[in-house]
């Protein structure tokens, strides 16, 4: 059986078979583990043939039914820093049969890759796609690619982040603003360009204090943008600060909230993994939204890992 494969010692082909559920009986959590192992090869191997093979195998999962898995696949491809992934991401963005959350993640990943050849496509979908989540994601990706290739980027004084992720926007320069209160105002000012609000968000993340976390939590309250709120929940999963747990639980429990926000809140609770997170996550295993149910499964696997002897 495929599930008996040791994912940490598996070949690329074995990882592909686990990821794509070739046997038909692989647990979702194990498919995610296979994905992250393939990502390590795609992002870190010096053998370009291996890198391209890992990326090709990862992209096979775009044929899957799982919205959660495909969205994570798109995210991972954006983190490989390899433009070989761009062809797959463009195809997903253009495919209206893919779920909005998957297409959004593909657009964001093109921004993470800094793919200048995708600018025209991103601009087209920014102007013409009916989904606000796709429009806003393309707006951010366009701004990120332009920023990355600008003189401004070379001149900015950015602190080295504790986090290795390639984010939808760079943090605000450390010499531009360092007061939490002012960053919070930029974060929550809906008249500011979304890119600047994201820059404030990632500056607050990198500050990482309880005060900064609570400032970020204020962005979950009344903002109309599901995209914006889902990014805050994602950032909380990186920070793993228990002070954010009440805001995440409130978000997860709010059935009026978009599934893309609630699912990210669930995964963040799995990463934080305090005792109060466990019963909350268990209570969402039968949620009305499939992506929230799947996220609860993955989050509980993360919770078990964080509280085990594996780390």
UniProtKB/Swiss-Prot annotation:
Q: What keywords are assigned to this protein?
A: Cytoplasm, Hypusine biosynthesis, Iron, Metal-binding, Monooxygenase, Nucleus, Oxidoreductase, Repeat
Origin organism is Debaryomyces hansenii (strain ATCC 36239 / CBS 767 / BCRC 21394 / JCM 1990 / NBRC 0083 / IGC 2968) (Yeast)
Q: Quick one: which gene encodes this? A: LIA1
Q: Does the keyword Phosphoprotein apply?
A: no
Annotated positions binding Fe cation 2: 230-231, 263-264
Highest taxon in the source lineage? Eukaryota
Biological role stated in the UniProt entry: Catalyzes the hydroxylation of the N(6)-(4-aminobutyl)-L-lysine intermediate to form hypusine, an essential post-translational modification only found in mature eIF-5A factor.
Which E.C. number(s) belong to this protein?
1.14.99.29
Protein name, UniProt field: Deoxyhypusine hydroxylase
Q: Where in the cell is it found?
A: Cytoplasm; Nucleus
Q: How does the cofactor attach, per the note?
A: Binds 2 Fe(2+) ions per subunit.
PANTHER family cross-referenced by the UniProt entry: DEOXYHYPUSINE HYDROXYLASE, PBS LYASE HEAT-LIKE PROTEIN
């Amino acid at each position: 059986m495929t599930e008996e494969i040791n994912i940490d010692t598996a070949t690329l082909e074995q990882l592909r078979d686990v990821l794509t559920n070739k046997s038909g009986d692989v647990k979702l959590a194990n498919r995610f583990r296979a994905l992250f192992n393939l990502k390590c090869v795609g992002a870190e191997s010096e053998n370009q043939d291996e890198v391209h093979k890992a990326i090709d195998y990862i992209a096979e999962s775009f044929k899957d039914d799982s919205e959660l898995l495909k969205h994570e696949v798109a995210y991972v491809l954006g983190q490989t820093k390899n433009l070989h992934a761009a062809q797959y991401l463009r195809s997903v963005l253009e495919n209206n049969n893919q779920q909005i959350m998957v297409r959004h993640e593909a657009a964001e990943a093109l921004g993470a890759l800094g793919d200048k050849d995708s600018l025209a496509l991103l601009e087209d979908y920014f102007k013409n796609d009916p989904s606000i989540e796709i429009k806003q994601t393309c707006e951010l990706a366009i701004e990120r690619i332009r920023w990355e290739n600008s003189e401004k980027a070379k001149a900015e004084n950015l602190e080295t982040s504790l986090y290795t992720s390639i984010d939808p926007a760079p943090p605000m320069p450390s010499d531009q603003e360092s007061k939490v209160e002012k960053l919070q105002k930029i974060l929550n000012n809906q008249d500011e360009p979304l890119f600047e609000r994201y820059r404030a968000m990632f500056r607050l993340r990198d500050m990482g204090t309880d005060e900064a976390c609570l400032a970020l939590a204020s962005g979950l309250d009344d903002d109309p943008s599901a995209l914006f709120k889902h990014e805050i929940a994602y950032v909380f999963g990186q920070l793993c600060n228990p002070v954010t747990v009440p805001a995440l639980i409130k978000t997860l429990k709010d059935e009026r909230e978009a599934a893309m926000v609630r699912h990210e809140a669930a995964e963040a609770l799995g990463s934080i993994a305090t005792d109060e997170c466990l019963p909350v996550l268990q209570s969402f295993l039968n949620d009305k939204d499939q992506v929230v149910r799947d996220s609860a499964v993955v989050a509980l696997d993360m919770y078990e890992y964080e509280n085990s002897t594996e780390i």
